[in-house]
């Protein structure tokens, strides 16, 4: 794989190393500009001479929402793996062409609140998706720099992600 790992906070000096300061920094960012930065990253990879044009996206928290937004915006996207990210609007789901592998944390009430409507839209539009709900986990369970980190479930989710990418991108 060729990877591009943009730091959404780079315009403010980059990720500060902890979630509390990171959340404060996120409040200072122009969300539309930030999303366009990620879209530009997709276009850079898609048009790069060294890629096969099979582009996948994986994102965590806000980046999970970016993965859903990329799936809506780019029919060329080959695979999308949002980890506990905000969902696409139901009316936008018909535009999704890429397969989705969605990871959710059972205790993440804020993100999970939107899942039933999103899943219904995915089903109604016959989209290719697989969703996993990780038991007794909280939002951010894959982030090993926080107390919410759950090594067992993080490893399982990552194994599933690599298998998914091998299937759709290799």
Model-derived regions, located:
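Gly/Ala-rich beta-loop-alpha elbow adjacent to hydrolase catalytic centers
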Residues: 59-63, 67
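Active-site loop/turn elements of alpha/beta-hydrolase fold enzymes
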Residues: 6-8, 85, 134-136
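Alpha/beta-hydrolase fold nucleophile elbow
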Residues: 49-60
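Serine-hydrolase catalytic machinery in alpha/beta-hydrolase-like enzymes
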Residues: 1-46, 143-145
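Short beta-strand/loop motif that positions the catalytic acidic residue
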Residues: 96, 101-104
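Acidic catalytic loop of the alpha/beta-hydrolase fold
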Residues: 107-112
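C-terminal catalytic histidine-bearing segment of alpha/beta-hydrolase fold enzymes
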Residues: 123-170
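A conserved short beta-strand
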Residues: 76-86
């Amino acid at each position: 794989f060729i990877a591009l790992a943009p730091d959404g906070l780079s315009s403010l000096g980059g990720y500060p190393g902890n979630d509390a300061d990171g959340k404060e920094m996120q409040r200072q960012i122009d969300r539309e500009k930030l999303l366009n930065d990620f879209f530009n990253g997709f276009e850079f990879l898609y048009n790069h001479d060294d890629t096969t044009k099979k582009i996948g996206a994986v994102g965590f928290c806000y980046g999970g929402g970016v993965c859903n937004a990329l799936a809506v915006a780019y029919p060329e996207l080959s695979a999308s793996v949002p980890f506990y990210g905000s969902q696409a609007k139901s009316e936008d789901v018909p535009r999704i062409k890429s397969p989705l592998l969605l990871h959710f944390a059972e205790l993440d009430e804020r993100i999970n609140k939107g899942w039933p409507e999103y899943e219904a839209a995915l089903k109604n539009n016959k989209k290719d998706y697989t969703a996993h709900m990780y038991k007794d986990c909280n939002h951010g369970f894959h982030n090993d720099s926080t107390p919410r980190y759950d090594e067992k479930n993080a490893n399982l989710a990552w194994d599933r992600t690599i298998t998914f990418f091998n299937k759709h991108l290799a």
